[in-house]
């Protein structure tokens, strides 16, 4: 008989054992709070270089006050799908604020970026369409693309020549990221917009990690690269990174949003985000738009870290954003380095396959405007000079 009362039909124990033996088993650590570039775990305080709170807004008093005010007015939860009674004036106001900020006709709110990305692809793409994706796109995009009836073609990371060879006129959707979440580099959006226009295909940006950090008033990667919003048919962004709250949105034409309201199953069949959360995000946007000084400070910290780490012999990815991949190579070496930093009171996450390709394990170091120069210096001191190959026990850089 296949399966049993003990093991079941799914091979859970074997799968977990295989992950553990490969040094890839994941687990969770409960924190006692994280804000302002700090983290408390098991009663100990750490410098936090692993969060996506790029502007340090997650603990901002004005956002917390707006959240509480929203709870007082609307309650703790939406209580229904947005197409029933879960859509409030607070949601509508946030959509209008986002549309004005980002230069799009209309916006639709989602509970998270994963569902927003998947909702768009599933609603738009049928068996007669083509989907082109950068090979380093987020798992939400890659996963949904592989499940759709359309044909998905992946092009090498930021390889516009390869994409141009793959394109067919008026057949579907090109998707790439503003800032790539594991490498910190930016998509080539001027070239992408030009190729989309020339081929008659639609273009979508996942700007989860660019929004709030890049461009005038934090408008994101398109603004930073001088790309008109109208040349990108679909914008997706999130509220849980630089904006310091949670949730996501899709922006574009009014017709696109009306279509998604009717055909995006992740939207139609989910309880809406709490109205109080929308109140908090609206307040956050106001702060982000005025945060030029914080963005300038963040840029200085990025430069300070990169210069210091390279002087110590560490290999970094080609990133000028808050995401700084410190490339280690083997998973075991990345875990050991992360543990050594924790012993020094510094928290930085080790990223291993399958999140990144085999042989490219890394510390994903993220900087925040809440950090100080002395915090970066303490991180560099904890890292110390990069060990030689022999000292690393055979580990190698990616």
Swiss-Prot record:
Lineage, highest ranks first:
Bacteria, Pseudomonadati, Pseudomonadota, Gammaproteobacteria, Aeromonadales
Modified sites of kind N6-(pyridoxal phosphate)lysine = 241
Keywords, ordered alphabetically: Biotin biosynthesis, Pyridoxal phosphate, Transferase
Please state the Enzyme Commission number of this protein.
Answer: 2.3.1.47
Which residues hold substrate? 26, 138, 355
> GO annotations under biological process?
biotin biosynthetic process
> A single GO molecular function, which one?
8-amino-7-oxononanoate synthase activity
Recorded catalytic activity of this chain's protein = 6-carboxyhexanoyl-[ACP] + L-alanine + H(+) = (8S)-8-amino-7-oxononanoate + holo-[ACP] + CO2
The protein's matches in PANTHER family, at most eight in alphabetical order, are given as: 8-AMINO-7-OXONONANOATE SYNTHASE (PTHR13693:SF100), CLASS II AMINOTRANSFERASE/8-AMINO-7-OXONONANOATE SYNTHASE (PTHR13693)
Its biological purpose is as follows: Catalyzes the decarboxylative condensation of pimeloyl-[acyl-carrier protein] and L-alanine to produce 8-amino-7-oxononanoate (AON), [acyl-carrier protein], and carbon dioxide.
What protein name does the entry list? 8-amino-7-oxononanoate synthase
Pfam families from the entry? Aminotran_1_2
Q: Which PROSITE patterns does the record match to this protein?
A: AA_TRANSFER_CLASS_2 (PS00599)
């Amino acid at each position: 008989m296949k399966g049993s009362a003990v093991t079941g039909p799914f091979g859970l124990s074997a799968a977990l054992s295989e992950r553990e033996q490969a040094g890839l088993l994941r687990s969770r650590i409960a924190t006692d709070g994280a804000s302002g570039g700090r983290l408390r775990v098991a009663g100990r305080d750490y410098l936090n270089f692993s969060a996506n709170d790029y502007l340090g807004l997650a603990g901002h008093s004005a956002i917390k006050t707006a959240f509480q005010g929203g709870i007082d007015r609307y309650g703790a939860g939406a209580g229904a799908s947005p197409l029933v009674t879960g859509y409030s004036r607070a949601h509508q106001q946030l959509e209008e604020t986002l549309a004005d900020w980002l230069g799009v006709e209309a916006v639709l709110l989602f509970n998270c970026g994963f569902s927003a990305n998947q909702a768009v692809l599933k609603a738009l793409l049928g068996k007669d369409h083509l989907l082109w994706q950068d090979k380093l796109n987020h798992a939400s995009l890659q996963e949904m693309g592989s499940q759709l009836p359309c044909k998905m073609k992946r092009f090498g990371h930021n390889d516009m020549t390869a994409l141009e060879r793959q394109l067919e006129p008026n057949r579907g959707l090109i998707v790439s990221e503003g800032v790539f979440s594991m490498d910190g580099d930016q998509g080539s959006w001027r070239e992408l917009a030009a190729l989309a226009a020339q081929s008659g295909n639609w273009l979508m940006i996942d700007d989860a990690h660019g929004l709030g950090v890049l461009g005038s008033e934090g408008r994101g990667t398109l603004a930073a690269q001088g790309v008109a919003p109208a040349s990108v048919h679909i914008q997706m962004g999130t509220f849980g990174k630089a904006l310091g709250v949670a949730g996501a949105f899709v922006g574009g034409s009014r017709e696109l949003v009306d279509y998604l309201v009717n055909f995006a199953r992740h939207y139609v069949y989910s309880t809406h985000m709490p109205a109080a959360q929308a109140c908090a995000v609206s307040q956050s946007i106001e702060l982000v738009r005025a945060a030029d000084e914080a963005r300038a400070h963040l840029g200085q910290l990025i430069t300070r870290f990169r210069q210091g780490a390279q002087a110590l012999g560490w290999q970094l990815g080609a990133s000028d954003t808050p995401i700084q991949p410190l490339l280690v190579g083997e998973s075991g070496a990345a875990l050991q380095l992360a543990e050594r930093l924790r012993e020094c009171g510094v928290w930085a996450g080790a990223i291993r396959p399958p999140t990144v390709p085999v042989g490219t394990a890394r510390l994903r170091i993220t900087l925040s405007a809440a950090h100080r120069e002395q915090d970066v210096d303490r991180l560099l001191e904890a890292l110390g000079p990069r060990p030689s190959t022999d000292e690393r026990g055979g580990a190698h850089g990616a």
